[in-house]
Amino acid sequence: MVVDFCRRFVARSLCIILMKHFCSSSVSEDLGCRRGDFSRKHYGSVELLISSDADGAIQRAGRFRVENGSSDENATALPGTWRRTDVHLENPEYHTRWYFKYFLGQVHQNYIGNDAEKSPFFLSVTLSDQNNQRVPQYRAILWRKTGTQKICLPYSPTKTLSVKSILSAMNLDKFEKGPREIFHPEIQKDLLVLEEQEGSVNFKFGVLFAKDGQLTDDEMFSNEIGSEPFQKFLNLLGDTITLKGWTGYRGGLDTKNDTTGIHSVYTVYQGHEIMFHVSTMLPYSKENKQQVERKRHIGNDIVTIVFQEGEESSPAFKPSMIRSHFTHIFALVRYNQQNDNYRLKIFSEESVPLFGPPLPTPPVFTDHQEFRDFLLVKLINGEKATLETPTFAQKRRRTLDMLIRSLHQDLMPDLHKNMLNRRSFSDVLPESPKSARKKEEARQAEFVRIGQALKLKSIVRGDAPSSLAASGICKKEPWEPQCFCSNFPHEAVCADPWGQALLVSTDAGVLLVDDDLPSVPVFDRTLPVKQMHVLETLDLLVLRADKGKDARLFVFRLSALQKGLEGKQAGKSRSDCRENKLEKTKGCHLYAINTHHSRELRIVVAIRNKLLLITRKHNKPSGVTSTSLLSPLSESPVEEFQYIREICLSDSPMVMTLVDGPAEESDNLICVAYRHQFDVVNESTGEAFRLHHVEANRVNFVAAIDVYEDGEAGLLLCYNYSCIYKKVCPFNGGSFLVQPSASDFQFCWNQAPYAIVCAFPYLLAFTTDSMEIRLVVNGNLVHTAVVPQLQLVASRSDIYFTATAAVNEVSSGGSSKGASARNSPQTPPGRDTPVFPSSLGEGEIQSKNLYKIPLRNLVGRSIERPLKSPLVSKVITPPTPISVGLAAIPVTHSLSLSRMEIKEIASRTRRELLGLSDEGGPKSEGAPKAKSKPRKRLEESQGGPKPGAVRSSSSDRIPSGSLESASTSEANPEGHSASSDQDPVADREGSPVSGSSPFQLTAFSDEDIIDLK
């Protein structure tokens, strides 16, 4: 009876999983085309702005980037009926001010040295725990005249780490002399000053009131009082404070003698103190028409808000109306009293780098609190971006160079005198000198005491980078994961979504996994799969089984696999797949796949230093029918593939991705990485051209991600800690154009990633114990989350990863308290290194869960509101399990379904899948039940999937060492989501109920703790 019950339970689970295959939402098609596509036009376009006086004479002109969203007022949704989730502070201080957060007041080492060019540098190193997550790691800061570089290095109790190896990881291998350790505790004050050169933690913004028809700055600054709407706007920005006796951040205003006015507007936002220089609150002089005192403050603000009254048709404000060489960003605010909404327009000086968040379409806000949050974030990000302009960057570089050289001159004499305490250049960092233990402990205690005093002084002064815990900010972030399968017992190698289930390659074989239902075996362990692609639109499964020299590519029909699962067949073995292998791919170590734009499937297989181009023979649109879907399991799609050509390279590629040409008739490209370079290869001619050369002794290639900016291909080249964006210029007369572009940019990750996922507007880097999230357009950091034992397994549509936590079976309070006590700055340890608990304590077991970040959460909530379905008719075929062919009908999809419609569709779909429906003919209102698999298959036969559907994936790469399993899932994904808005079973992908997500990647504490317990 027990056996029969288990069989019935597994059969029921299998039935539920198979039903979900056909319940994919059409949202995926809308999101897929957005994932890898991005446009800088969302961030404005550069215009020449000319201002004139009342007589029409030209006064001034300037080039500014203008952001005004879209002028389309006929949006499908009214402004204010949605909530943005892409409003983030870029490079937030609580993530970037490392020295204050992780070093100051803690035991750490500081070193001084000269590079090969005899320029001095400083290095700070500490070993810290990532917020009691039992993830010890090294943090290092390199201070140079060009700026600071920050990296994290993994901690290993068995592997020694020297200063030389840390500098080598920062690409600094040559020195004039070996670095020497600085023991003087006062060095902490000097290094804190160096970090403060990155910019102020607090901000001052100008607020200028302009009446209707005012065209010059003299007229605007001469407004003695504001209007009622202007006062309402000031109340929205912050609190009105009395300057005399004010003890908070004053923003350059006089708080003793009232020489800069009696009142001002002040607020605190996410730990930042903000003082507004309001024109009507600054001193007014009837004799001075130019109002010099007002211009002195507002004219010296980097960012100024201009509140302009009047109708939309009246002459609008232009930055050239203001005579200021210092103000780089103007935010034009208009208030509509009739509709009670605000309209926003941003002007940025041409040299200011792009910054977010992009304005919505249309840029109108009816939710005033949402408008305040958006405006403050935009202004803070704008001032930070302005500091990266050549003018400010050169000043900061000169100041930093002067401070470093001055500090170097002051310290060198003391270092030469105190040779007894000098440590060897190659000393292991965690070890302290065995001799004079008591003296060393006393020195460390004094070192920590002085550091804590400096930290307290900065906090009292208001210059400390505060955490979000003090700001009360609590919002759901788009990257918040959901638990897909708890207590996953296997080691995942790679995976790919199949409908709403997940096809996972594990150490026990390939399994079909969905939620906490029992896993269904598809292939046994004799077929060790390292890469896979589930192509539902083509009814294909492509995978690479790696078994030494016998490695090959295998192709299967999904319908045949599904039929076998319905028949409760055991998992296929390698011997059962003889008819499904592509013989010429023997010995392959990597492959990449591409289906966007093209009418045919393209696969490039790497066999040592040889590339083999394979395509699938083009099927006619009528080729995909219900009859072909029910073909026998023995029928293999191998005969449908043809070998086009072979291309020989100079070395075996470690990373490979396919790039579409700029037009249908243009040559497609292959980007490969080997040795110390990234090359692009013409698929037609086999010619290879250098794209980028890596200047480093050791190179760890991570990914080459193809993205498309306004239809033009670009590549994100990722290696070591670096990520570079380069435009891919088309072939011209047989030659490849390699030239620098103004759109190219480069940034560094804080921790070396093993996988990168692009989901516009975000770039997600996966490391062994953290997730780092940046923006595609500028590489700015928006979030860092600690995720112990993080392993990415799939990213082609939704992102799936596993994470391991130490779950205490008895109590979770003791270990947490112990970790806190160990890290308390009040009790400095007697060694150079704090003692960390082991990854698993006594009475604890490993718990590995499978998590999911829905793609629609990342790419579906930015720019437009709401996301609109393409208004085109599509031909829909019935779900696969129905054996009777049904007539196809054109259907226009809509994302706005009521709850009753969703339930009705789900119920009708379930009845038809189980063969309980008496109606064989289709109905127009039932069309959404024919989910994405049959629809996409027919779209492919008629001309391929929608452009851009797979554009945001990380490239295929060779796994290395322990990172093999996570990185192979990066293979050029196909952009459709496995999630569904229309399936009640999949309702978990929306806003999860309390407790549905085991941890949240949101900023609640100093390091945004993720609790996996």
Curated annotation (Swiss-Prot):
Region (Disordered): 810-842, 913-1013
Modified residues (Phosphoserine): 45, 426, 432
Ranges for domain Rap-GAP: 191-407
GO biological process: regulation of small GTPase mediated signal transduction
Membrane-spanning residues: none
Highest taxon, organism lineage: Eukaryota
InterPro entries in UniProt: CNH_dom (IPR001180), Rap/Ran-GAP_sf (IPR035974), Rap/Ran_GAP_dom (IPR000331), Rap1_Ran_GAP (IPR050989)
Keyword match Phosphoprotein: yes
Keywords recorded for this protein, A-Z: GTPase activation, Phosphoprotein
Entry-annotated residues carrying Phosphothreonine: 827
Compositional bias segments (type: Low complexity): 811-821, 952-962
Comp. bias regions, Polar residues: 963-982, 993-1003
Full protein name: GTPase-activating Rap/Ran-GAP domain-like protein 3
Organism name: Homo sapiens
